[in-house]
Regions:
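RNA pseudouridine synthases
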Residues: 1-264
Length: 264
């Protein structure tokens, strides 16, 4: 990043009239190339692909993450991707956080992209997640709040007062409970950034392993939150038939379940 034609340190305070040049950053992002990165392709045809994303993989290139993203892998492994989101996010209709694993649908052409985006906007695309959270969740329920950027920490999202954020709607169902933990199914009715992570923390049941929203020390030696996009239902853009995809929990997720099942 150049300011008035000169390189500056990260802590430089901008002044009125400063000219900022981001050309070098943009060029580096746009120069991302296909990379031979193995990915789990659950399904694909000429219109869509459904991917089981692994934990730790960023979905698309951005500043500080130019390589090793899902987009780099998609560019190598698929024959075509939609262009609606440009060269930085080809094919990407919705996202999963870096440390959230599971199912994600990709558009292979622009017609499919429009259809899938409309389904998400109209809430006809059903997205089901499983998570292990702290504490015993006693009943099923739903959370409807406003979510926006946390005014105290710009890296986080937060529940805000009415009118200060965007509406976020999550339905949750208790699958199993242990002494101090619960396995919970979450259904997204909206798709706000970090929505499930924020809502679970808001109900005082933060997700195990969530380094951003869970202040408690994790006891299970994890690399990230135990949040997995387990089930995805959509209408195929061309055939107009309903399709449902489901994937197994990752090994590290199953490991924690086994530990809890065998704990006294």
């Amino acid at each position: 990043v150049l300011v008035n034609g000169n390189k500056v340190k990260a802590g430089y305070n901008l002044k009125l009239g400063d000219e900022i040049d981001l050309k070098s950053v943009v060029e580096k992002v746009l120069s991302s190339k296909p990379q031979d990165i193995p990915i789990d392709i659950v399904y694909q045809d000429k219109d869509i692909a459904v991917i089981n994303k692994s934990q730790g993989m960023v979905v698309h290139p951005a500043v500080s993450n130019y390589d090793g993203t899902l987009v780099n892998a998609l560019m190598f492994n698929l024959d075509n991707l939609s262009s609606i989101n440009g060269v930085i996010r080809p094919g990407i209709v919705h996202r999963l956080d870096k440390d959230t694993s599971g199912l994600l649908v990709v558009a292979k052409n622009d017609q499919a992209h429009v259809s899938l985006s409309e389904q998400i906007a109209n809430k006809t695309c059903k997205r089901i997640y499983w998570a292990i959270v702290e504490g015993v969740v006693k009943s099923n329920g739903e959370i409807i709040t406003q979510i926006g950027r946390d005014p105290k920490n710009r890296l986080k999202m937060a529940v805000l007062e009415s009118g200060k954020g965007k509406t976020a709607h999550t339905i949750f169902r208790v699958i199993k409970t242990w002494d101090k933990y619960s396995l919970v199914e979450f259904e997204l009715k909206t798709g706000r950034t970090h929505q499930i992570r924020v809502h679970s923390a808001y109900m005082h049941h933060p997700i195990v392993g969530d380094k951003l929203y869970n202040p408690n020390k994790c006891k299970f030696n994890l690399n990230g939150q135990l949040l997995h996009a387990k089930k995805l239902t959509l209408i195929h853009p061309t055939t107009h038939k309903e399709m449902t995809f489901e994937c197994n929990l990752p090994d590290y997720f199953e490991r924690v379940i086994n530990i809890l099942d065998n704990s006294k």
